Curated annotation (Swiss-Prot):
GO terms for biological process: mismatch repair. It comes from Salmonella agona (strain SL483). Keywords: DNA damage, DNA repair. This is DNA mismatch repair protein MutL. The gene is mutL. One of its GO terms (cellular component) is mismatch repair complex. Residues 366-405 are annotated as: Disordered.
């Protein structure tokens, strides 16, 4: 058989095999189009489980007459126009395949009217070449899509459809998921002429809880713990059921959304399951309704044909962020259910060519805003529902990379393995008693030694040893405690009874060193460390520190600071001249005693006179 271009109808039917799985798939695609069009009310009429009729009517912005034919064509969309748009998707749809695919396996009619038009227009495609016919019609502002006789021309696909009740249950579940994603939209679902579901648009917190209860049931609402967790461009909101009271009926409630898009993501589910594992039985599953907001540049939604899955650029970071957010709420075990607070999202700039994608909360026309200041890492030490100082996760102006570079680099350094510094050697000869400087750095020798010249003498200085002494000085508290730096992702570790007792005994001293933690029955959560430790592999260093403390009978801040300084990893495997000069300046400022009385292993004089005499004799 020769190579040939497939006719449009056959090509669309092949694409429909990926997008249109069953009537519920059609409903999902069409309702998402309505939401992208800025609709605040969507009516869904179903007959015979969707096999006979699917009608979606909305009050969105509508489609212009000139664009109706394009709306039914493949790869035609108003939602993206360039590769930059594809890398930062803000609408629910973007491929431009749904209408063409659906029309190829059904009798589809599209009727629409914009506010600028005096009359509505109707379009439908038919024939082998999918030619589009457009004619005038009567219709208010908005769009109506009618899908008749789904799979009428693909008998094999129609055989795989289940009973009318089963197919409608799938449609009902899709509408439930959409209703949880968009509290601001009224959704009416009818089956065979009877109104089955009616979700009215809500705005206030109490009304949101009523919709949550109507969809998920009163038992879930009674056990729901509200989550409000943020760091930088990552925000986690929603509800998770108290695992101590989770029943089998609640385990079916597992809804997660990424930037408003309903999702079935294994990474998110694993993070939630891991946070609840200490409180859940072996055969139990967590129940949750969670909303993750993230910079669109940091997530790829162009992965699954039906857009059920996403791929995070910083998957481990997202996993641990969700894990800590859920864990913090479960640890507090608040008795009252806290509603999500209405927080006005920061205005988001939408490129002009994408305004047609809709006026929903993913595409709010915005005024120019000032550059956003870096967000302070947020970690919860009080109530989970508080949002003091919270910034909106919105406002991604054509997507500048958010946390990817600075925080991502910090996170990647956590995967490095520290090396132990060498033991001190005998004390080196002291410099001139009146000296305030090690001298001038001439060059770097062997990658980790600085060749110094001072008062006509030449010496080698060990940069790792100098760095260790500097770090010890930075960690040793003076008149005030060392400043604690909140961790990007708090570190949770399992500890023994002896280790927990040692930590509690040394907690005040560790606090002076800038190490803050909370402990429960079998775990300790490190929430802050001093600045010199931010770049360290804390997953190795902290357990070793806990083991060291468990072996001690008495504690002193100087000894703890000395142990930490000896066991941290150098930030400079290969030193440069600039780094050496900067290090020595800090050592001379913070450790002036090292200049007057250098400890062993720091300085080694170089005997130039012997070398010069040897050259003269030759």
């Amino acid at each position: 058989m020769p190579i040939q271009v497939l006719p449009p109808q056959l090509a669309n039917q092949i694409a429909a095999g990926e997008v249109v799985e069953r009537p519920a798939s059609v409903v999902k695609e069409l309702v998402e189009n309505s939401l992208d069009a800025g609709a605040t009310r969507v009516d869904i009429d179903i007959e015979r489980g969707g096999a006979k009729l699917i009608r979606i009517r909305d009050n969105g912005c509508g489609i212009k007459k000139e664009e109706l034919a394009l709306a039914l064509a493949r790869h035609a969309t108003s939602k993206i126009a360039s590769l930059d748009d594809l890398e930062a998707i803000i609408s629910l749809g973007f491929r431009g395949e749904a209408l063409a695919s659906i029309s190829s396996v059904s009798r589809l009619t599209l009727t629409s009217r914009t506010a600028e038009q005096a009359e509505a227009w109707q379009a439908y495609a038919e024939g082998r070449d999918m030619d589009v016919t457009v004619k005038p019609a009567a219709h208010p502002v908005g769009t109506t899509l009618e899908v008749l006789d789904l799979f009428y021309n693909t008998p094999a696909r129609r055989k795989f459809m289940r009973t009318e009740k089963t197919e409608f249950n799938h449609i009902d579940e899709i509408i439930r998921r959409i209703a949880l994603a968009r509290f601001d939209v009224t959704l009416n679902l009818s089956h065979n002429g009877k109104l089955v579901r009616q979700y009215r648009a809500v705005a206030k917190d109490g009304q949101k809880e009523r919709r949550l209860g109507a969809i998920c049931g009163t038992p879930f609402l009674e056990q729901a713990l509200a989550i409000e967790w943020q760091h930088g461009d990552l925000t986690l909101r929603g509800w998770v059921a108290d695992p101590n009271h989770t029943t089998t009926a609640l385990t079916e409630i597992q809804y997660c959304y990424v930037n408003g898009r309903m999702m079935r993501d294994r990474l998110i589910n694993h993070a939630i399951r891991q946070a609840c594992e200490d409180k859940l039985g072996a055969d139990q599953q967590p129940a949750f309704v969670l909303y993750l907001e993230i910079d669109p540049h940091q997530v790829d939604v162009n992965v699954h044909p039906a857009k059920h899955e996403v791929r995070f650029h910083q998957s481990r970071l997202v996993h641990d962020f969700i894990y800590q957010g859920v864990l913090s709420v479960l640890q507090q075990q608040t008795e009252t259910t806290l509603p999500l607070e209405d927080i006005a999202p920061a205005p988001r700039h939408v490129p002009e060519n994408r305004i047609a994608a809709g006026r929903n909360h993913f595409a709010v026309p915005a005024e120019p805003t000032a550059a956003r200041e870096p967000a302070t890492p947020r970690y919860s030490g009080g109530t989970s529902g508080g949002n003091g100082g919270r910034q909106s996760a919105g406002g991604w102006p054509h997507a500048q990379p958010g946390y990817q570079k600075p925080q991502g680099e910090v996170y990647r350094t956590l995967l490095q393995t520290p090396a132990t510094s060498p033991a001190p050697e005998p004390v080196a000869p002291a410099l001139d008693g009146h000296s305030q400087s090690f001298g001038r750095v001439l060059t770097i020798v062997g990658g980790d030694c600085a060749l110094l010249e001072h008062a006509g003498t030449i010496q080698l200085l060990s940069l790792p040893v100098a760095e260790r002494w500097l770090r010890q000085a930075q960690l040793t508290p003076g008149q005030s405690p060392v400043c604690a730096q909140p961790l990007l992702i708090p570190l949770r570790l399992k500890v023994s009874a002896d280790e927990k007792a040692a930590l509690q005994q040394a907690q005040s001293l560790l606090g002076e060193l800038g190490i803050e933690f909370q402990s429960d029955a079998q775990h300790v959560t490190i929430r802050a460390v001093p600045l010199p430790l931010r770049q360290q592999n804390l997953q190795i260093l902290i357990p070793e520190l806990i083991g060291y403390l468990a072996q001690q009978t008495t504690f002193a801040t100087v000894n703890i600071a000395q142990w930490i300084a000896r066991n941290v990893q150098s930030e400079h495997p290969q030193w440069s001249m600039a780094q050496a000069i900067s290090l020595l300046a800090d050592v001379e400022r913070l450790c002036p005693q090292l200049v007057k009385a250098p400890p062993g292993g720091l300085l080694q004089p170089v005997d130039l006179h012997s070398a010069m005499n040897a050259l003269k004799h030759e």
